[in-house]
């Protein structure tokens, strides 16, 4: 008597594997996309550092006062004007002793305009914070 030897996977085994892969993908993809978005914040860090250095040069040229310093009259090109820029930048609340630089994510590459990165310079030092997708930035 001959026995039929069947080889391969049953339909049930294939369905179970598909379900497991689907569950793993649903857990991993949101984390992947947030990591990709968070990595785009490095562009803003580099630009904010350049703006900060320009503000310090402006501070010295203005005789120790940040109020005369704005993106329009500084010695660097606005980083938002560079091709492929993902952020727009603003200098808010410039005072005699400090300033605030705000980088707002634009809609390029799937960004949203509600996510911001803020750098605050005071006599105590520099602090960074974020909103929206960048809430964990320090």
Residue ranges and their predicted role:
Residues 2-33:
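N-terminal single-pass transmembrane signal-anchor helix
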Residues 18, 45, 52:
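Conserved catalytic core of two-component sensor histidine kinases
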Residues 5, 48, 52-55:
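Short amphipathic alpha-helical/adjacent loop interface patches that line ligand
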Residues 31-49, 62:
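Aliphatic-rich helix starts adjacent to a transmembrane/signal segment
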């Amino acid at each position: 008597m001959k026995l039929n030897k069947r080889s391969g996977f049953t339909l049930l085994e294939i369905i179970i594997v598909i379900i497991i892969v689907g569950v793993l993908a649903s857990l991993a993809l949101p984390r992947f996309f947030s990591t990709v978005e968070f990595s785009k914040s490095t562009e803003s860090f580099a630009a904010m550092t350049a703006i900060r250095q320009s503000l310090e040069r402006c501070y010295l040229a203005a005789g120790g006062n940040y109020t005369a310093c704005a993106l329009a009259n500084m010695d660097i090109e606005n980083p938002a004007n560079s091709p492929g820029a993902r952020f727009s930048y603003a200098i808010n609340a410039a005072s005699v002793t400090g300033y605030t630089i705000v980088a707002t994510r634009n809609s390029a590459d799937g960004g949203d305009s509600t996510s911001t990165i803020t750098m605050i310079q005071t006599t105590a030092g520099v602090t960074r914070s974020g909103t929206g997708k960048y809430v964990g930035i320090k």
